Amino acid sequence: MRWLLTSSALLVPAAALVRPDGVGLTPALGWNSWNAYSCDIDADKIVTAANEVVNLGLKDLGYEYINIDDCWSVKSGRNTTTKRIIPDPDKFPNGISGVADQVHALGLKLGIYSSAGLTTCAGYPASLGYEEIDAQSFAEWGIDYLKYDNCGVPTNLTDQYTYCVPDSTDGSNYPNGTCVNLTDAAPQGYDWATSTTAKRYQRMRDALLSVNRTILYSLCDWGQADVNAWGNATGNSWRMSGDITATWSRIAEIANENSFLMNYANFWGYPDPDMLEVGNGNLTLPENRAHFALWAMMKAPLIIGTPLDSIDTSHLTILSNKPLLTFHQDAVIGRPAYPYKWGYNPDWTFDPEHPAEYWSGPTSSGEVFVLMLNSEGEVKTRSAVWEEVPELKDRGTKKNSKEKKGFKVTDAWTGKDLGCVKDKYEVKLQAHDVAVLVVGGQC
């Protein structure tokens, strides 16, 4: 195992899991079966998704992982002799390796799912206590990515303390992101990397590192046990909340939570706000656009979760946005965009309905990306004031100069050249929509 001590851009030092072949340097791009099909999966659906990633041009944009989620194995148990998980022969008649061969032949990579418990979330055999056996199986089958969930944990392996995850999935109230009713809180200075949750995930990390194949490791412990403190030393990404749904309220809530974790995101490790819901449910086109843009600017893993053989052009266009994908995959600058102004609320307000509305981030090309969100339920005007954007406010200014600052600006959605914009850029946005600006040189 090779380790690199890095700084997560501003405040939080982290030990990052570095792979010599560069896998995991930037956030993952791919597709996953769960949001599209739940348990109703088979080899044909997985291979169809892989073919569509190629045919729709998504592979050319960097999408590479085709991930099988829960429900892929025989539910009744493991092979009694080898103790290996058995792929469901009805769903996968040629085994997982047969699907891997087809996916690899397209120049793509195959992912699979398990859990750090006795059973998966859908009740199938999981990997706790079988980490080495399963890691070896995955390697032999040609697996390139493991999503590792947090279901089926026996009571004797639950944590002795409870960590505050200010997420509505448990039905609690979190005033300004605090856990006022938290029971069994850890004592001050407690090292969550020594918790039983962390150890369960570390065991699979070590098993994956012991096999002769690089397997990207995606932790899915829902933000428990202060995973932000040890996730980067354990895997390539880590879920920071409960599950996403195809509703704007849930997307906004997760974006709000993750906005306070951006100092943990950098090369080799990224907080994961869950898979994309673009194309699912009753999300409006602006909501789909805002969802994708926020996830891309946060440098979250971008894992598509909709049936690609029936995706409409408008949703495909969102998922194919080259400027945002270029920002997301920058191989020189690892930090994501940061909120620089909350807009609807005073700065640093924790509000599940109204996340931070103004974000900015640098690129290796010298351009600055600026995102403006309308978190309200009606048309509103938003303004990006150059003097407020951290990456722009000191760029090329002259002391005591009264001349307004101007920058060359491009609309990231349309590619339209917006010309030389002085002082600020103002735009009317539909409910729950975003504007994304690519700000270039001065003019």
From Swiss-Prot:
Residue positions the entry lists as glycosylated: 79, 156, 176, 181, 212, 232, 282
Residues bound to substrate: 221-225
Gene Ontology terms: cellular component: extracellular region
One GO BP: carbohydrate metabolic process
Disulfide bond annotation, renumbered to this chain: 39-71, 121-151
Induction: Expression on xylan is very high, whereas elevated expression levels are also detected on galactose and xylose.
Record carries keyword Glycoprotein: yes
Active site location: 149, 243
Signal sequence interval, chain numbering: 1-16
Substrates-to-products reaction catalysed: Hydrolysis of terminal, non-reducing alpha-D-galactose residues in alpha-D-galactosides, including galactose oligosaccharides, galactomannans and galactolipids
Pfam families xref list: Melibiase_2 (PF16499), Melibiase_C (PF17801)
CDD domains referenced in this protein's UniProt entry, alphabetically: GH27
GO-annotated molecular function: alpha-galactosidase activity
Cellular localisation: Secreted
EC number in record: 3.2.1.22
Domain of life: Eukaryota
UniProt keywords, alphabetically: Disulfide bond, Glycoprotein, Glycosidase, Hydrolase, Secreted, Signal
Keyword Ligase in annotation: no
Enzyme class: hydrolase
Function (record text): Hydrolyzes a variety of simple alpha-D-galactoside as well as more complex molecules such as oligosaccharides and polysaccharides.
UniProt family annotation: Belongs to the glycosyl hydrolase 27 family.
Protein name, as recorded: Probable alpha-galactosidase B
Species per Swiss-Prot/TrEMBL record: Aspergillus niger
Gene: aglB
